[in-house]
Amino acid sequence: GVSKREGKGGVTMKQQLEPLFTPWKIGNCEIKNRIVLTSMGGTNLLGWMEVNHFDKDGAKFILEVAKNNCGLVLSGCQPVYNPMYGQWLYKKKKMYEDLAKWMPKFHKTGAKLFVQLTAGFGRSFTISEMMETLYTNKALRVLAKPFMDLDKITAAPSPSPNRWSDKVPSREMTVEEIQEFITAFGKTAKLLKDAGVDGVEIHAVHEGYLLDQFTLKYVNQRTDEYGGSFENRYRFAVEIVKEIKKVCGQDFPVSLRYSVESKTKGFREGALPGESFTEAGRDMAESEKAAKYLQDAGYDMLNCDNGTYDAWYWAHPPIYMPENCNLEDVAHIRKFVDIPVVCAGRMDPETAAAAIADGRIDGAGFARQFLADQE
């Protein structure tokens, strides 16, 4: 239970945290409290970077968190196109059968589950020395292609430098490839819905991942329908949610992982808290417009932070970043939408509870805290 020791202003800690334990809704999906386990490595239900399978270790961790009164679980990021062996997630049907058998056990906890689906990394894909060798040696690249097609995995909106390696540049994705991903999101979401999952989260117009790269002017230099204007840059993300709603129904909840501001000066150069700089990516003015635009396209929730892989420490804030480092920006964007907004990034429960009580955010995202203590 929550400690009864005195908190701020003479109220008990239990009273101070009460806003975290109030119900809310994402579309028609009611969540019992405002505590959200956000996605992180090791919480995948359908495997990761390996032959796809129902991941019993990930399921065990998620179930333990759910049993300890977490309201909404966002399971680990699942690529709709698995980088290893080039497998489309919707083609591996058995793991969805295993997931369906597990879901009643999860739902007994009273928690709700959204599975996070990603289009991938684009220029942010982490490149190891072995991958550099595979890519730069043409013979090895051909031999490795069936299980590690770096050319496809790292494809981006436009030719651009990889975040980590100068030896593996990104090529431009084709329109046909974009359409393949959109179709895959719909098919995968339908399989998850049929397995009993409560919703999905799209990864991501966030942190400079592939979908986000399409929205960012400093990465996206396309001249077709997926580049140039505001509407074109956000088209990929919009067409994904529309496809999911078409296949799964308008009432099936779809969240979006969303970075309010990029906090980025350019390729491989991020901004620090309080620094004066020229934003190369999404600034607040564009974000105000984008948040509503994405809501109107069909997204039912925004799961928010800041940053790109060029400014990674906003989305994965280490100890030297301020606590609640994304809260002010996320609370600001909340004014421009009618859908619920979750804030993540070194959140402390007391500050989160106060922000929820004041209507500044709707839910609080925690991840590493649950690794330390599932209770």
Task: Identify the residue ranges that each predicted region occupies.
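Flavin-dependent oxidoreductase catalytic cores
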Residues: 4-5, 9-375
